[in-house]
Amino acid sequence: MGKIDVDKILFFNQEIRLWQLIMATPEENSNPHDRATPQLPAQLQELEHRVARRRLSQARHRATLAALFNNLRKTVYSQSDLIASKWQVLNKAKSHIPELEQTLDNLLKLKASFNLEDGHASSLEEVKKEYASMYSGNDSFPQNGSSPWYLNFYKQTMDLLTGSGIITPQEAALPIVSAAISHLWQNLSEERKASLRQAWAQKHRGPATLAEACREPACAEGSVKDSGVDSQGASCSLVSTPEEILFEDAFDVASFLDKSEVPSTSSSSSVLASCNPENPEEKFQLYMQIINFFKGLSCANTQVKQEASFPVDEEMIMLQCTETFDDEDL
């Protein structure tokens, strides 16, 4: 008998509840004034559309990951080993990359011994620096809040949260923490983002940079992008942003490769379960704990929108917290 996935059961129960609300008939209340205001069904229909959009986004995301894993599998394995699982591919790549670096280093040393000056890198360290500059330089991405700025923000935020004791190092690996950080980034005003970029350009990359920017006087209310769960840009929205997908994938891979021992198939689920609270309410509380910490710093207007007559948004966040990828995706 297979292992019961509690998260999937909770998520399924949420879907059943949503479907029951959608299929509820109006005969239960025959008041014509109530039937004249179809606000509740309209919001339920919008909620259903948003869930469908997010699932489509996740399906595309998984298809992209599957293609990347297939290419990596073909690179690190021979044709006879193309059925290797994803964690086997990642661990094979962990040893394959140093082998390639060693080969490149030997070739570069051979080139240097013959005094071959071709204008290109002459050492492994120079190659690494050139490669890093290709993907982290200011000219590689637009300076409008895309990947390099978000990665700097993510690192500083994580350092500030762990240094302040808001989260533990173990909790730093949770997807809900990434969701909260993405929400904070989406809610930063353009003025605060510009202040952070200026500090990063001056190579002040410590956690104090973020804390100081958060303590600046609050900007006008209209300049703050309150995304909440209605936004299509934040992680708690129903469509993942490119920078969120980029960093979550990179963080998952880095965490996986950081393990000193290869997990067995039977223990992989238990390893992942130990890093994820099974109770969606605990995930939601952790999310709000991070948000409230930065609200205390006046970092952003990070209130989650709530409809007084139809408080669906909080349930949607908790539904988000129950979503997990299958074990085979890891």
From Swiss-Prot:
Q: Which UniProt keywords apply?
A: Coiled coil, Cytoplasm, Differentiation, DNA replication, Meiosis, Nucleus, Oogenesis, Phosphoprotein, Spermatogenesis, Transcription, Transcription regulation
Judging by the UniProt lineage, the source's domain of life is Eukaryota
- Please give the Gene Ontology molecular function terms for this protein: protein dimerization activity
State the Pfam families in the record: bHLH_STRA8
Main localization of the protein described in the UniProt heading:
cytoplasm
* Keyword match Transferase: no
Coiled coil region boundaries: 88-112
Q: In which tissues is it expressed?
A: Expressed specifically in testis and fetal ovaries.
PTM comment, free text: Phosphorylated.
Result of changing residue 25 to I: Found in patients with non-obstructive azoospermia; uncertain significance
Q: Which InterPro entries match?
A: bHLH_STRA8, HLH_DNA-bd_sf, Stra8
What's a GO cellular component annotated to this UniProt protein? cytoplasm
Q: Where is this motif: Nuclear localization signal (NLS)?
A: 50-55
A GO biological process of this protein is: regulation of transcription by RNA polymerase II
Please indicate if the UniProt record lists Coiled coil as a keyword. yes
Compartments reported by the entry:
Cytoplasm; Nucleus
* Job of this protein: Meiosis-inducer required for the transition into meiosis for both female and male germ cells. In female germ cells, acts downstream of ZGLP1 as a key effector of the meiotic program: required for premeiotic DNA replication and subsequent events in meiotic prophase. During spermatogenesis, next to its role in meiotic initiation, promotes (but is not required for) spermatogonial differentiation. In complex with MEIOSIN, directly activates the transcription of a subset of critical meiotic genes playing a central role in cell-cycle switching from mitosis to meiosis.
- Subunit record text: Interacts with XPO1. Interacts with MEIOSIN.
By what name is this protein known?
Stimulated by retinoic acid gene 8 protein homolog
Organism, as annotated: Homo sapiens (Human)
Gene label: STRA8
